Regions:
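TRNA-binding/sensing appendages of the translation machinery
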Residues: 17-23, 27, 41
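Soluble acyl-CoA-dependent acyltransferase catalytic core bearing the H(X)4D motif
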Residues: 1-8, 26-37, 44-55, 59-408, ...
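Short secondary-structure boundary/capping segments within folded domains
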Residues: 14-19, 367-368
């Protein structure tokens, strides 16, 4: 048996009916040339032959003395984990997203390994889909994306590729923070006590400076600046998932014309979409929304190590002009990255944990609903740069399906694939009605920036 880390156990303790703690991914494929009408059925038969899962997909939970452990499941039943399903006609993307929304709402059985794979046929246009989900205590979102990518091939002629549960495990790598890793960062404050204590003077000084700067400049973000908003209401267990691909060239062209990074432009697009959505719901706060955003602090071309921090970014939702909104976002992100870059890794980690503490405290106890560090999570994750195939089928899109939390009812996660940015929006269905309209508002956000940039 293997004990779960404190952070992984925390994802289990946080789980409740209205707050499932699994991450997922939707992959959309087109049929290979010459594929017959039984192609997906034959693919399902092939996948069923992989009945012996590799680690960690053969592990189930057990509990001793109040703590969770992993142990091998000696009664593994593939039929429970792998499901072959069909969409109702007419099999549009609307029906597919409705199906994923319903599946992502369901809790998983803790008496079995905490993962599922859904092979979905009947998608209009000779396409099929894969929806994978796994509990965050078993695998984090970034690792799930890497595993799903490793199951693919750049060769359209490669056949008999195993599914992700049957791949040989790789040595665990340091990964970028995912949308819920601010919870994990809170637990780090109790680890390596000597090192952590030595960071306290710097952390307190930087928090104080950020509060002072926020008092002098309303566009600067500090720890308690996020306004109350419908995005931060209590959630139910019902989910709505929306997804769309947007051209990366359009985003890059805006950034080049307006001297902004691609991440800045993405935040501006999201800020525009959220502003229009909240106006439509008669719920736009007077103060700007604050996003929690993982960003890179790497100063060189090195690849090793983890040089990622989670910052708070002003989304400028109180500003109607798209150019002015982008300027506020650029300044906000630049200020936050500068502050982080001047700290040691331990100081940056603890600064992140302290600034996220109000949200973490409320999430764990519900005692401080007025202490809101941020309103929404926006993550941008690198994906495959070349076209990918799975048993001859071309991957057309790859969309993250993430975790809304009580008080953080919307999660926006992006994945880059080839020349596309794949947006995956996951929200509480009741808290944020008609959330799928955000897709139209995202397109509008791109168009208004293109106009502002004279493109």
């Amino acid at each position: 048996m293997k004990a779960l880390s404190p952070a992984d156990q925390l994802f289990l303790w946080l789980e409740k009916r209205q707050q499932p703690m699994h991450v997922g991914g939707l992959q959309l494929f087109s049929f290979p040339e010459g594929a017959g009408p039984k192609y997906v059925t034959e693919l399902a038969e092939l996948l069923r032959t992989y009945s012996e899962p590799e680690y960690p997909f053969n592990q189930r939970l057990t509990k001793r003395l109040g703590s969770y452990y992993w142990k091998e499941d000696h009664h593994f039943d593939l039929e429970h984990h792998f499901r072959h399903e069909a969409l109702p006609k007419p099999g549009r993307i609307r029906e597919l997203l409705t199906h994923i929304s319903a599946e992502h709402s369901n809790l998983m059985d803790r008496q079995r390994p905490l993962w599922e794979c859904h092979l979905i046929e009947g998608v209009r246009g000779r396409r099929f889909a894969l929806y994978n989900k796994a509990h965050h205590s078993l695998i984090d979102g970034m690792s799930a994306i890497r595993m799903a990518t490793r199951a693919l091939s750049n060769d359209p002629n490669a056949k008999d590729l195993p599914p992700w549960w049957a791949m040989q495990p790789k040595k665990r790598e340091a990964t970028s923070p995912t949308a819920t890793d601010f919870i994990s960062s809170l637990t780090q404050l109790s680890n390596s006590a000597g090192k952590q204590l030595s960071t306290i003077p710097t952390v307190i000084r930087e928090v104080y400076k950020s509060v002072q700067q926020a008092n002098e400049n309303p566009d600067t973000v500090s720890i308690f600046q996020a306004p109350q908003c419908i995005l931060n209401a209590p959630i139910t267990g019902s989910r709505r998932f929306a997804a769309q691909s947007y051209s990366m060239d359009r985003i890059k062209a805006i950034g080049k014309a307006m001297r902004a990074t691609m991440n800045d432009v993405v935040l501006a697009i999201c800020g525009s979409a959220l502003r229009n959505y909240l106006i439509n719901q008669h719920a736009l706060p007077d103060q700007p929304l604050i996003a929690m955003v993982p960003v890179s602090l790497r100063k060189d071309d090195s690849e090793g190590g983890n040089q990622i921090a989670m910052i708070l970014a002003n989304l400028g939702t109180h500003i109607a002009d798209p150019s002015d909104r982008l300027s506020v976002i650029k300044a906000s992100v630049k200020d936050a990255k500068k502050r982080m870059s001047q700290m040691t890794p331990e100081e940056a980690l603890n600064y992140t944990a302290l600034t996220m503490a109000p949200t973490g405290l409320n999430l764990l106890t519900g005692l401080a609903p007025g202490l809101q560090a941020f309103n929404v999570v926006i993550s941008n994750v690198p994906g495959p740069k070349k076209a990918c195939y799975w048993n001859g089928a071309k991957l057309e899109g790859m969309y993250p399906v993430s975790i809304p939390l009580d008080g953080i009812a919307l999660n926006i996660t992006l994945l880059s694939y080839e020349d596309q940015l794949e947006f995956g929006l996951t929200a509480c269905r009741r808290t944020l009605p008609s959330m799928q309209r955000l897709l139209d508002y995202l397109e509008n956000g791109i168009k208004e920036l293109e106009v502002a940039a004279d493109l």
